[in-house]
From Swiss-Prot:
NAD(+) binds at W109, W172, E210. GO terms for cellular component: extracellular exosome; extracellular region; plasma membrane; side of membrane; specific granule membrane; uropod. Belongs to the ADP-ribosyl cyclase family. It is found in: Cell membrane. Glycans are attached at N66, N95, N148, N192. It comes from the Eukaryota. It comes from Homo sapiens (Human). The keyword Electron transport does not apply. This is ADP-ribosyl cyclase/cyclic ADP-ribose hydrolase 2. ADP-ribosyl cyclase and cADPR hydrolase activities are both activated by Zn(2+) or Mn(2+), and inhibited by Cu(2+), while Mg(2+) and Ca(2+) do not have any significant influence. Catalyzes both the synthesis of cyclic ADP-beta-D-ribose (cADPR) from NAD(+), and its hydrolysis to ADP-D-ribose (ADPR). Cyclic ADPR is known to serve as an endogenous second messenger that elicits calcium release from intracellular stores, and thus regulates the mobilization of intracellular calcium. May be involved in pre-B-cell growth. Pfam families: Rib_hydrolayse (PF02267). Disulfide bonds join C51-C67, C83-C163, C144-C157, C238-C259, C271-C280. Optimum pH is 6.5.
């Protein structure tokens, strides 16, 4: 009986261990499959809301965009395997949402997303990709279908590290190509000179999808702004490191270009939140004018005193 009891006890322990193993496997299966963020909550509502709001920014002849049709065209990618979505899957979406970009208003960027959005000021100053309709509806969002199901995956979505043809990267590739083709006049580019890997990513959306699709006959020149973060390192500036690669590439392509370190209007915007930082101690002509103002005022007063005495003297004689 004792032997039978021990055998039963060992069997129970084995069953418990097996159950624990099954639970661990189930928990592992529930973990995020992909490296990226899952589908944004309320994706459809956000998309349609942004689309409806953006139409007011368009010229009257372009405001007849059908947001529902644009969503349905976008949703085609949500019906595909999350590693089998191609840039061309967004062709209809782009065609339905595309509109003209004002001349001289295009603003390309790398590693400066928030600063670009702030400086563009909702299309008032510039119109970067995130401020055209097809970019606005997807900015800062994530989306994908579940791997083996038709529902959306709210837990994780693939990045380029998981697979090349993922929904989000393919979207921005297609959008970047269209944005480049529609840009004209003076092309502006904002790069991050504090980025550890260099201001100009040799492999990136700007290098791989935007520069190759610029329409040379529509472009006057390219103006590059290399911005440095307030208090951050000065890793690269114009003519240094990866910037030399970019400048040579543009020159070889026949583009006229210029490069400016810490473009003043953008620098002033950066300093709004860092007004007391040494990087924001601007030595401007205005400050020099203010310092000289008292002496100028004194000279003006002195110049007025002599005529005043003459007037008083003439009245006394009368």
């Amino acid at each position: 009986m004792a032997a039978q009891g021990c055998a039963a006890s060992r069997l129970l322990q084995l069953l418990l261990q097996l159950l624990l193993l099954l639970l661990l496997l189930a928990a592992g299966g529930a973990r995020a499959r992909w490296r990226g963020e899952g589908t944004s909550a309320h994706l459809r509502d956000i998309f349609l809301g942004r689309c409806a709001e953006y139409r007011a920014l368009l010229s009257p002849e372009q405001r007849n965009k059908n947001c529902t049709a644009i969503w349905e065209a976008f949703k085609v990618a949500l019906d595909k395997d999350p590693c089998s979505v191609l840039p061309s899957d967004y062709d209809l979406f782009i065609n339905l949402s595309r509109h003209s970009i004002p001349r001289d208003k295009s603003l390309f960027w790398e590693n400066s997303h928030l600063l670009v959005n702030s400086f563009a000021d909702n299309t008032r100053r510039f119109m970067p990709l995130s401020d055209v309709l097809y970019g606005r509806v997807a900015d800062f969002l994530s989306w994908c279908r579940q791997k083996n199901d038709s529902g959306l995956d709210y837990q994780s979505c693939p990045t380029s590290e998981d697979c090349e043809n993922n929904p989000v990267d393919s979207f921005w590739k297609r959008a970047s190509i269209q944005y480049s083709k529609d840009s004209s006049g003076v092309i502006h580019v904002m790069l991050n000179g504090s980025e550890p890997t260099g201001a100009y990513p040799i492999k990136g959306f700007f290098a791989d999808y935007e520069i190759p699709n610029l329409q040379k006959e529509k472009i006057t020149r390219i103006e590059i702004w290399v911005m440095h973060e307030i208090g951050g390192p000065n890793v690269e500036s114009c003519g240094e490191g990866s910037m030399k690669v970019l400048e040579k590439r543009l020159k070889d392509m026949g583009f006229q270009y210029s490069c400016i370190n810490d473009y003043r209007p953008v620098k002033l915007l950066q300093c709004v939140d860092h007004s007391t930082h040494p990087d924001c101690a601007l030595k401007s002509a205005a400050a020099a004018t203010q310092r000289k103002a008292p002496s100028l005022y004194t000279e003006q007063r002195a110049g007025l005193i002599i005529p005043l005495f003459l007037v008083l003297a003439s009245r006394t004689q009368l």
